[in-house]
């Protein structure tokens, strides 16, 4: 299932043995047929007439596409252990022997040929008919209903049965009556005169109900076709009593044919509940995939928790006294949310009254419901009010304010405006799905990563409080050579001047202009050519639909997403009406996301302007989809090098909080056996020397000692030369390594002097992420030491965690999941949780500061004076919290448990560009946050 099929894979004549008639039919297939078959997908080339893309049946009426195939390992893990007749398999042992791979591959070209013949005879259903069909059963069953692919629901509505069909039987038995081919080739008996309950029709014919099985036929041999089943498709081609004979007559020779049946059980149940099954499966497919088999229990527990989303109107019609007329949309339909909905008048009164009294809009309120505190966030636009209510114990108020902003941003990106999203009836199922995911992520964050280890689940849940609401994307720093290779691959794609993407190929204007792209690997952003606003819009969309965690665990075999989007950066009116400012073209914008394994490539396209104008609701063009796939395939060899970067030592170095709870002797020993410092050769010898036996915890002399010269400078003028007396710069190697080098004699001094000469060539601090050619000049031993970078001064590393946000480029850096996994203990996970929650509160203070500074700038008359006022009054904001913690499982009654103190400090930089830094370090550190910030941000570029 994870195999990638492309619509430009035209089989050669060598791949079609024993079929000389194919060349004659090629001549009969004229250009007019090709154009009509291509439809709105604008592929007039015959290369795309051989095989329809596998995602084509999943394109919706409005042109949107959300197609997800799981990886093979993921499908096997989700399938039930005991085989059933309706599990997701495309072949069974009775039909195709699994060990006989070559025999199975022999028939694959004939499947392509079969599709091509059906296309030429115009038996393939038209795309417009597929989109406009209101039938509950989709054409490509397994692709439309992803819950069947995951294997979560055992009893499935549709099943695929592979049977062996031999048209040579027709030479013995001549088909003279209608539907005889169905009996002769397949062994299925259908009585057209029987009175059978019809729940729907496909085409103009009657549904093919299985009334009997021919003894010895292929259907009976399979053991999977039952009386009462309905044959709905042959090789994903809709079949009814009208076209079944023509479809079967197109089979070129002996081959395996896939028959898609609707189960008899569901046919009978459909009459009493025709829509309920379809709605439930569509709205929770992705939820089931993300949260696993426990999704029903999770959703049930979530329904018992008070939470609600309401979109209300403030303009009521006094003439009509319709009940709940002010509610335009609300979710969910649960008893707990019903209580919140019943007090909506309070929210409307607060919104109107406080704005009239204070002149400012209300942002949040809190209320007690059955003894439980509920936070409610407000968002007012014109005469509409959006409310989101969540329990205070699950979602703190600062996070809820950020969450409602993210919801607004995502909905505007998807629909253009809130009214377009909430005021259209056809969007209600999509919004239900949207907020189903939203509340699951808010109330059950740990369950999202059910396949991960408990420590990883805990970190993901605790970090999501802060990281999911930052205006940026998680950035992974890579070596320069890898970065250049990624940039070249994306640049080639964005140029779009080759093959079918070139305007000269068809001698017509191209369909879309590629505005930019961004590449993710295992959930990390590794390369981006998008403006900051577009990057954040796309990242928030992917984050909401949990696409990044899926790619991180390689649960994606193939992912294709296509939809029209409304990036506010391009659509908002210009504040400056000057003619010199570049005006955005009046075009439409589309988002294409293609994922393969760990990779996910997001492409923003523009229709209009330099490209052709989009008419109606265009679906994805297979040429662009294939080019994006090709770009990802070109990066197959890069993933191993990126994995090496993820598996390497943390840069910068981190320490575990539990190491600081022990005594001096135990503390020194724990440092030598830590997974970080153990990579340094000879560390154990240094640790046992008397000069290094010093108590880190409780040694308050560390607080009063002067900082090293290299760390006292806030700029880059003399930051590198300050460590000349120490041999190594303190921020690049531990002091223990420096002492080891000095004890090695003259050879060590000579090597140290050589390194010093190299570093003194530059007058700036060494970049901790891109060491450049300096690494190449070092021997292997020196390279191992040099790669271990720490940001704090002193003999020991006291940095526990950090988050650095670069708002101009829309990225942030923080320790990777692999780096955090190396640090475990009794109090370190709690430290990480406290860090993210504390940073959330600190950032709320920073956001309020930015609002006040912005108001000051607007109130001042001259623009230049406003800039001076901002920079002169509060150029830097800093806020910190001191924590003390001790192990909770302390059993020694004679001794008091050790206590460790650590700081969580946040700093806001307004100039020269907005930046935010949050660090967690031991109380004994002498660094100030601005020094760490300089080292973190130095050289951090896309």
From Swiss-Prot:
<dbReference type="InterPro" id="IPR036034">
    <property type="entry name" value="PDZ_sf"/>
</dbReference>
<dbReference type="GO" id="GO:0021915">
    <property type="term" value="P:neural tube development"/>
</dbReference>
<dbReference type="GO" id="GO:0042733">
    <property type="term" value="P:embryonic digit morphogenesis"/>
</dbReference>
<protein>
    <recommendedName>
        <fullName>Protein inturned</fullName>
    </recommendedName>
</protein>
<dbReference type="GO" id="GO:0045880">
    <property type="term" value="P:positive regulation of smoothened signaling pathway"/>
</dbReference>
<keyword id="KW-0970">Cilium biogenesis/degradation</keyword>
<dbReference type="GO" id="GO:0005829">
    <property type="term" value="C:cytosol"/>
</dbReference>
<keyword id="KW-0966">Cell projection</keyword>
<dbReference type="GO" id="GO:0035869">
    <property type="term" value="C:ciliary transition zone"/>
</dbReference>
<dbReference type="GO" id="GO:0031069">
    <property type="term" value="P:hair follicle morphogenesis"/>
</dbReference>
<dbReference type="GO" id="GO:0036064">
    <property type="term" value="C:ciliary basal body"/>
</dbReference>
<dbReference type="InterPro" id="IPR043987">
    <property type="entry name" value="CCZ1/INTU/HSP4_longin_1"/>
</dbReference>
<dbReference type="GO" id="GO:0021513">
    <property type="term" value="P:spinal cord dorsal/ventral patterning"/>
</dbReference>
<feature type="compositionally biased region" description="Low complexity">
    <location>
        <begin position="37"/>
        <end position="46"/>
    </location>
</feature>
<dbReference type="InterPro" id="IPR043988">
    <property type="entry name" value="CCZ1/INTU_longin_2"/>
</dbReference>
<dbReference type="GO" id="GO:0033365">
    <property type="term" value="P:protein localization to organelle"/>
</dbReference>
<dbReference type="InterPro" id="IPR001478">
    <property type="entry name" value="PDZ"/>
</dbReference>
<dbReference type="GO" id="GO:0031514">
    <property type="term" value="C:motile cilium"/>
</dbReference>
<dbReference type="GO" id="GO:0051782">
    <property type="term" value="P:negative regulation of cell division"/>
</dbReference>
<keyword id="KW-1186">Ciliopathy</keyword>
<keyword id="KW-0963">Cytoplasm</keyword>
<keyword id="KW-0225">Disease variant</keyword>
<comment type="function">
    <text>Plays a key role in ciliogenesis and embryonic development. Regulator of cilia formation by controlling the organization of the apical actin cytoskeleton and the positioning of the basal bodies at the apical cell surface, which in turn is essential for the normal orientation of elongating ciliary microtubules. Plays a key role in definition of cell polarity via its role in ciliogenesis but not via conversion extension. Has an indirect effect on hedgehog signaling.</text>
</comment>
<dbReference type="GO" id="GO:0060271">
    <property type="term" value="P:cilium assembly"/>
</dbReference>
<dbReference type="GO" id="GO:0043587">
    <property type="term" value="P:tongue morphogenesis"/>
</dbReference>
<dbReference type="GO" id="GO:0044458">
    <property type="term" value="P:motile cilium assembly"/>
</dbReference>
<dbReference type="GO" id="GO:0042073">
    <property type="term" value="P:intraciliary transport"/>
</dbReference>
<dbReference type="GO" id="GO:0043231">
    <property type="term" value="C:intracellular membrane-bounded organelle"/>
</dbReference>
<keyword id="KW-0206">Cytoskeleton</keyword>
<dbReference type="GO" id="GO:1902017">
    <property type="term" value="P:regulation of cilium assembly"/>
</dbReference>
<dbReference type="GO" id="GO:0016192">
    <property type="term" value="P:vesicle-mediated transport"/>
</dbReference>
<dbReference type="GO" id="GO:0030278">
    <property type="term" value="P:regulation of ossification"/>
</dbReference>
<dbReference type="GO" id="GO:0060021">
    <property type="term" value="P:roof of mouth development"/>
</dbReference>
<dbReference type="InterPro" id="IPR043989">
    <property type="entry name" value="CCZ1/INTU/HSP4_longin_3"/>
</dbReference>
<dbReference type="GO" id="GO:0007399">
    <property type="term" value="P:nervous system development"/>
</dbReference>
<dbReference type="InterPro" id="IPR039151">
    <property type="entry name" value="INTU"/>
</dbReference>
<dbReference type="GO" id="GO:0060173">
    <property type="term" value="P:limb development"/>
</dbReference>
<dbReference type="GO" id="GO:0009986">
    <property type="term" value="C:cell surface"/>
</dbReference>
<feature type="compositionally biased region" description="Acidic residues">
    <location>
        <begin position="22"/>
        <end position="31"/>
    </location>
</feature>
<dbReference type="Pfam" id="PF19031">
    <property type="entry name" value="Intu_longin_1"/>
</dbReference>
<dbReference type="GO" id="GO:0005814">
    <property type="term" value="C:centriole"/>
</dbReference>
<dbReference type="GO" id="GO:0001736">
    <property type="term" value="P:establishment of planar polarity"/>
</dbReference>
